[in-house]
Amino acid sequence: MSTLHDLNGATIAFDLDGTLVDTAPDLVGALNIILAQESLPPLPFDDVRLMVGRGARALLERGFAAAGAPLDAEQAPALVQRFIDVYLARIADESAPFPGVVEVLSDLKTAGAKLVVCTNKLTNLSTALLDAVALSPFFEAVIGADLAPAAKPDGRHVAAAVAAVGGDVSRAVMIGDSVNDALGARNAGVPGVLVSFGYTEEPVETLGADLVIHSFLDVPKACITLLTSCPAPNTGL
């Protein structure tokens, strides 16, 4: 009978926004502050929520377009930095871990799994967020897009995260919420699990994950299933 002990020594990589933490409220708030500073109308929460997860520049590009003023390429770097500053100042005003996250991470760590964050968010923002919501102690490393050879969906990002904690892709799982996570896992030769409660515009069942789960409490069972019964997929590296 499979148990949590089967995950001893395994590496589990987690996306951050929309997977571990519901960050949309603070990201939407920061975007709307920038839009207001540029004399543009605020955007509805539900619209912006689906724009989250591809990095600050992508969020600003989509947000400005939705507000009726495409982002000017020359002004973009300064606006991105201003957005980051605004967001960092309120990074966990309303953000919180999804239900079950703390319990599951504690169980996985106790079982001996190596836990790492693999996110397209900048590393400094990621660590600040994890500190603010008290999740940092669970993770051995945080690999943001700026620390990877290329960001997800490039498999080298997932592979770099696994390597950062001394893991092996042959005994690793990627947990995320988007097509970038599913493809990043597949391209690294790692089985991928997607949660259904995150930030994606497409039906999560269509994104090519090995498993889809509807509660974070199902993460351990999904990892055990994939690591004990399924060979690792062929790497695209």
Curated annotation (Swiss-Prot):
Q: Which UniProt keywords apply?
A: Carbohydrate metabolism, Hydrolase, Magnesium, Metal-binding
Q: Which GO terms describe its molecular function?
A: metal ion binding; phosphoglycolate phosphatase activity
Q: Where is the active site?
A: 15 (nucleophile)
Q: Give a yes or no for keyword Methyltransferase in this entry.
A: no
Q: Which InterPro entries match?
A: HAD-like_hydrolase_sf, HAD-like_sf, HAD-SF_hydro_IA, HAD_sf, PGP-like_dom2, PGPase_prok
The terms describing its cellular component in GO are: cytosol
What cofactor(s) does the depicted protein rely on?
Mg(2+)
Q: What class of enzyme is it?
A: hydrolase
EC number(s) stated in the UniProt entry for this protein: 3.1.3.18
Q: Which residues bind Mg(2+)?
A: 15, 17, 177
Q: Which Pfam family, just one, is annotated for this protein?
A: Hydrolase
Which reaction(s) does its UniProt entry say it catalyses?
Answer: 2-phosphoglycolate + H2O = glycolate + phosphate
Q: Give, as in the UniProt entry, the pathway in which the protein acts.
A: Organic acid metabolism; glycolate biosynthesis; glycolate from 2-phosphoglycolate: step 1/1
The organism sits in which domain of life?
Bacteria
BP-aspect Gene Ontology terms: carbohydrate metabolic process; DNA repair; glycolate biosynthetic process
The family note in this entry says: Belongs to the HAD-like hydrolase superfamily. CbbY/CbbZ/Gph/YieH family.
Question: Main role?
Answer: Specifically catalyzes the dephosphorylation of 2-phosphoglycolate. Is involved in the dissimilation of the intracellular 2-phosphoglycolate formed during the DNA repair of 3'-phosphoglycolate ends, a major class of DNA lesions induced by oxidative stress.
- UniProt xrefs under HAMAP family: GPH_hydrolase_bact (MF_00495)
Q: In its UniProt entry, what is this protein called?
A: Phosphoglycolate phosphatase
Q: Which organism is it from?
A: Caulobacter vibrioides (strain ATCC 19089 / CIP 103742 / CB 15) (Caulobacter crescentus)
Provide the organism lineage as a comma list.
Bacteria, Pseudomonadati, Pseudomonadota, Alphaproteobacteria, Caulobacterales
The encoding gene is gph
